[in-house]
Each structure stands twice: as structure tokens, then as C-alpha cells.
């Protein structure tokens, strides 16, 4: 098992478990259907949220390094995966808007990091896994499949927002934002985990060159 991938999967698992734990601990205080995951960053457990997201980011970067070293990922795919990691680090460091006091620069930076992260991971999964579909490696196929699901999910969110805008509704009013975001996050973490399992697996053979992705 490739060491970077092994540590990466461990960090991703720990980060995801920590964030799920925060959700479970806050069930009586916060509506997960309406409140986003980043809401945890505003409370007294904010440091735990930051730690969980940072673990996800570091684990993702380690998986990206493993994929690149094994020549399973090209430059474009690796950059996309690192963009996801960078976006996560931004969301961990900068808290979201606290609407009880109004918008803030930190909240705007947090939102930008979230958008970069959520858009980059599906692209990374598709770009990295697509050239390897012929190898029929289950983890690579899973990463590609969940990458497609994530893209379709994002497109669906965009379509709903556009329909709501035509009706005069703000984007956060047209869907149960917390639920939608959590589903997207779960889909993307599954795609990431599949990439990690693929990177940690046995070599699929000597590769003379990879695609541009």
C-alpha cells in the first residue's frame, strides 16, 4: 500500500468522522436540513470543525501526491485535487458569515473557498479516473461515477437557484440548503475515498505515459 495514500485515507476518514460527530452532537441545537455544515465553525466547537476540515484537506493532498507519484494522475487532475484541498483549508481558516451580526470579509472568503472546493473535486475525479476506465479498476470506476453524480448534483442546484430567482426567491430559500450541501459533501468524500483506495491499491501495471489529466 502506498504510504501517502494510506495516511491520506486515514486523515480523510478522521476528518469526516469528526464533522459527522459535530452534526450528531448539535442535532438538538441546529437544523441540519437548513443550516450548512460551516455553521459549526461559529460555535464553541468551531476549532473542532476547523480541525476536521483541515484533516480532509491534508488527507486529500496526500492522496493527490500518491496518485501523481504512481503516475495515475496527470498535471490537470492533480491541480484540480489540490484546488479542492486549498479550498477546504480556506473554509477551515475563515469562518462563514455570522448573520446575527451581518456579512463579513471572512464570510466572503469562506464562501469563495467553499465554491472552489465543491467544484474542484468532481472535476478532479473525472479528469483523473476517466483515462483509466478501460482498466476496470473498481475504485477508479467508482471515483468516475461519483464524480459524475457530483457534477449532476451541482447542475441541479444551479437549475433550482435559477428557477427560484425567476420567482423572486433568494438561492437559500429555494432548497433545504443544509441537506443539499451535506448530500453533495458526502458524494464528493466518497469520490475522494475511491481515489484514495485506488492510489493505495496494487499497481495496475507499468505506465509509460499518462493523459494530460
PLM regions with names:
Residues 2-10, 72-83, 136-149:
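Interfacial segments of alpha-helical transmembrane regions
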Residues 13-31:
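Alpha-helical transmembrane segments of multi-pass membrane proteins
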Residues 29-44, 98-107, 166-177:
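Membrane-interface interhelical loops and short amphipathic "cap" helices
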Residues 39-58:
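Interfacial helix-start motif at the membrane-water boundary
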Residues 63-73, 126-141:
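Juxtamembrane helix-break-helix junctions at the cytosolic face
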Residues 90-135:
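Membrane-proximal helix-loop-helix units in multi-pass membrane proteins
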Residues 130-213:
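Terminal transmembrane helical module of multi-pass membrane proteins
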Amino acid at each position: 500500500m502506498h504510504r501517502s495514500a494510506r495516511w491520506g485515507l486515514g486523515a480523510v476518514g478522521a476528518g469526516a468522522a469528526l464533522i459527522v460527530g459535530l452534526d450528531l452532537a448539535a442535532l438538538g441545537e441546529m437544523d441540519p436540513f437548513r443550516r450548512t455544515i460551516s455553521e459549526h465553525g461559529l460555535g464553541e466547537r468551531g476549532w473542532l470543525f476547523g480541525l476536521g476540515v483541515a484533516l480532509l484537506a491534508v488527507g486529500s493532498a496526500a492522496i493527490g501526491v500518491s496518485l501523481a507519484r504512481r503516475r495515475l494522475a496527470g498535471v490537470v487532475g492533480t491541480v484540480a485535487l489540490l484546488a479542492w484541498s486549498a479550498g477546504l483549508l480556506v473554509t477551515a481558516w475563515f469562518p462563514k458569515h455570522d448573520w446575527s451580526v451581518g456579512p463579513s470579509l471572512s464570510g466572503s472568503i469562506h464562501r469563495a473557498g467553499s465554491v472552489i472546493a465543491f467544484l474542484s473535486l468532481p472535476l478532479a475525479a473525472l479528469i483523473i479516473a476517466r483515462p483509466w476506465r478501460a482498466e476496470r479498476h473498481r475504485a477508479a470506476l467508482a471515483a468516475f461515477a461519483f464524480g459524475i453524480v457530483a457534477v449532476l448534483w451541482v447542475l441541479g442546484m444551479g437549475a433550482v437557484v435559477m428557477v427560484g430567482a425567476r420567482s423572486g426567491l433568494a438561492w437559500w430559500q429555494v432548497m433545504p440548503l443544509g441537506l443539499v450541501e451535506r448530500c453533495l459533501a458526502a458524494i464528493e468524500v466518497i469520490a475522494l475515498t475511491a481515489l484514495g483506495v485506488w492510489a493505495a491499491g496494487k499497481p495496475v501495471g507499468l505506465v509509460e505515459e499518462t493523459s494530460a489529466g
